[in-house]
């Protein structure tokens, strides 16, 4: 990495300028805190850049209990509270799946729309500057989202500074904030336990089965009930569906996929609204 980029990372929390940013005419800045390391760092940068920032978190009712601790730690770091948004209709992902009779496809999952998009849209105002914690390797996805949502003003300070997720882990460690439990269990992202968007990832589901057997079994039963499979495996050169309860025994060996559930999933989620 270039020395200039390294320097940017070292001073990122002291910086008060977002590259190419501008406060919206209304003056309202909203940071979408997802309880992940990247969104925490992005929120802190936004606060030091803009001063007054409204921090919001969409509670899906299906994430790890340790997230409550992480939120409190981050609130102390931010020096202000996080506003929790919640669906008025559904308490968790399973209620969404059962009501919609659907889990996931290549076009997305209904849980994102109901538990994240709708609560977020209810507080959104035209002219808001929105802060998201997307990292340096996601710039192409941001460009696509901006093209399709030209009415929204988006700032991604981590992309502006070429900051990666690993950089964010290091920053939180330096300020004494313990990472969420899901990371420590080997999950790449701090998403819902048993995220159905982890498609074609047998190792991910082995990790869910190992640490969260109750959620694994509940999702497996829903697959059978709805006749929908989340995963496929390659056999004899062909991709074939496999139910969760058919996954062979054993511990996960590979790395989890980089599962996204937020800003870039929202356009897909529109079809389930």
Task: Walk through the language-model features, giving the residues of each.
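Nucleotide-activated chemistry modules centered on ATP-dependent adenylation/adenylyltransferase
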Residues: 2-273
